[in-house]
Every structure is written in C-alpha cells, then in structure tokens.
Regions:
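Fe(II)/2-oxoglutarate
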Residues: 1-57
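Short non-domain terminal segments
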Residues: 9, 19, 36-39, 60, ...
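Homeobox/homeodomain signature
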Residues: 11, 19, 47-52, 87-94, ...
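Acidic-enriched, low-complexity/disordered segments with a strong bias for Aspartate over Glutamate
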Residues: 13, 22-25, 40, 82, ...
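Intrinsically disordered, low-complexity regions enriched in Ser/Pro/Gly/Gln/His and often acidic
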Residues: 20-22, 73, 106, 138
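A generic signature of intrinsically disordered, low-complexity regions enriched in glycine/proline
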Residues: 26-29, 44, 105, 160-164, ...
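Non-heme Fe(II)/2-oxoglutarate
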Residues: 34-133
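Catalytic core of non-heme Fe(II) oxygenases with the double-stranded beta-helix
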Residues: 114-226
Length: 226
C-alpha cells in the first residue's frame, strides 16, 4: 500500500518530460499541468462536476499537456505487461482481471501520483462520497487498449473503496470504440475529453466492463483507492 507523503521534492531519472516528475514547486507544476477549472477550484472557484448515474462523478483534472507527456513517457519506457493473469509485479503473482498496462512504480511516477490523489482527487471524492476519507492507494497504472492486443475488459468490481479513471486521449481522433459500461445501471460512459477524471465506488456497487476499442489506441489511468 502507498500512504500519503508530505515530500514534494520528487524527481525522476526518466529520459523525457522531466518537468512532469518535478513537483518541488507545486504551484508551478499545477500551472503547467492542471486543467484551468481545477486550478480555479483550488483557489475557491467553481468546477463542473457531472453525475450521470448515482455516485459516478466526472470532473476536469489535467490539461492535454499532462496527458500527452504521460503517454510519451509510457511509450518511451515500453514496460507494458502482457495482459495475463500471472503477474510478477504483484505480491501474490496473480491478477484476477488483467490488463495490458504499466504501473506507475515502474516509471518512477508512484510518489507523484500519490500526491495527485491526496491533493486533488480526494478533494472531489470527499465531497461526493460524504463521510468518506482517502487513506491509501492500492494500485495505479496506465492501461493500453488496441484492437490487435487487449481491446476490452470483462465485467468486474474493482478492489477499492473507490476507483479513479482518467482519459488520456481522444475518442474519434486517436481511437474508436472504448468506454466503460456500468452494468447494473445500464449506462455507458463515453468521455471524449482527455484529462477528465471519473471516480466511482469500487468493490460494492458499480459492476462494470471495458468496452471494445475497435480502432487506434486508447490510453487511460486507473487508480484503486481506499
């Protein structure tokens, strides 16, 4: 488990996009990478939060620079898993619902994402899920969907109190298809906006599946949070 850290002097030896890793000046980092609405929200302003079904909240979090640079880092590192159940990265060596993905700790972005969850995502979660408190992060990674590789994900519940998903590229331009179907609610979530975050309850109520990506490559961040 990853718990909250107050350390903001975080750097990485990644070869590209070093500024994304450097959160030593948090205000400068926010200026570079947060969506303008979320920056306004941090300063006491308003933010657009959509709730299309009960307890699913979508809001603008990152700008497109963040999304593009993170995709570039993931492809430069090229540490994608094979999408099989056996996974040596996990303590028990087994993933029940595997995806083709790269964990943030594989690219040196785990501490940064930890800070993003506690500083930004948790602020929205604790407004939407009244009475909840974000205490730790179970796992965080970027998933890659392609027609020739893993193109969808079977129905499942997440191993989390709540989960966060962030779209990193554009439906209709970078890929076709995709999205998430919440089965019990009979609702398909098809965001087209890179940098928008969706949060929803994990292990109990929001049974869901990843819909087929039929063209191009779809990238999303997934984070399981307690």
């Amino acid at each position: 488990y990853i718990k909250e850290s107050n350390n903001i002097n975080i750097f990485s030896d990644n070869k590209i996009n070093h500024e994304l890793f450097d959160m030593s000046d948090i205000k400068l980092w926010e200026k570079k990478y947060l969506h303008h609405e979320f920056k306004d929200f941090l300063n006491g302003g308003q933010i657009s939060i959509c709730e299309p079904i009960p307890y699913l909240f979508e809001f603008p979090l990152f700008n497109e620079r963040f999304c593009n640079e993170l995709i570039e880092i993931m492809e430069e590192n090229n540490k994608w898993s094979d999408g099989r159940h056996n996974d040596k990265r996990l303590s028990n060596g087994y993933e029940n619902v595997p995806t083709v993905d790269t964990h943030f700790n594989q690219i040196g972005f785990e501490k940064q994402w930890n800070k993003i969850v506690f500083n930004y995502i948790a602020k929205i979660a604790e407004k939407g899920f009244v009475g909840s408190h974000t205490s730790r992060i179970n796992m965080s990674f970027v998933v890659k969907y392609t027609p020739s590789g893993q193109n969808k994900l079977r129905p499942h519940n997440d191993s989390s109190l709540y989960s966060a998903m962030v779209a990193l590229n554009k439906r209709g331009e970078d890929f076709e298809g995709g999205g998430t179907r919440f089965i019990r609610h009979d609702y398909k979530h098809l965001t087209q906006k890179p940098g928008y975050c969706v949060i929803f309850p994990g292990r109990l109520t929001h049974y869901h599946e990843g819909l087929e990506t039929t063209k191009g490559t779809r990238y999303i961040i997934v984070s399981f949070i307690e």
